[in-house]
Amino acid sequence: MFITLKDNDELVSVKKTTGNDEILMASSNGRMVRFNESTVRIMGRSASGVRGINLDGGILVGMEIVEPNEYVLVITENGYGKKTPVDEYRITNRGGKGVKTVNITEKNGSIVSFKTVDDSKDLMIITDSGIIIRLAVDKISTMSRVTQGVKLINLKEDSIVSSTSIVDREEVSDDNINGETIEKESEELSFFFTSSYIISLSVH
């Protein structure tokens, strides 16, 4: 066992870090924190970790390592999305609620995914009804933190976005990019993220 989970908790993400990276964590209710990993002390392998974000009734939708000149790409359950320069997210206190990353309304719904990206990548959006759509990241609107985004995928009635993935542009043939729909049914690790907690382990 490499982490102790609390009741009703689950492991969400694992990332390799340098020891001085900046971390982004986002909740489904539209908030995001950015903090330096140096604020998380090194712990034993089976520790539960310390709080990374106050979810305030939401759930953790992911975490990313901050890279210069990248965008934060946010996708909501009703198929809306946007990208925002990472510099718009100021450093906040680890364990706090963070800053608003999207204006959540009945129209766009809760956040289901966020990624840090650059314009050389493609975005795959997957719905709970088995639809996949691929979009070039450079075609997605760049907007401020507090906007609701624009519609990226038309959903069937009662369908929602279930997950997303960032892929290299050459991984899939040109027949499946820019909005075409497809229908179908040992490195060293140092950071572990559960529903709202974070643990740092020495990799040596």
Regions found by a protein language model. Name each.
Residues 193-195:
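Generic detector of N-terminal low-structure segments
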Residues 1-191, 201-204:
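C-terminal interaction appendages of subunits in large macromolecular complexes
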Residues 197-199:
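Short, low-complexity segments with poor structural confidence in diverse proteins
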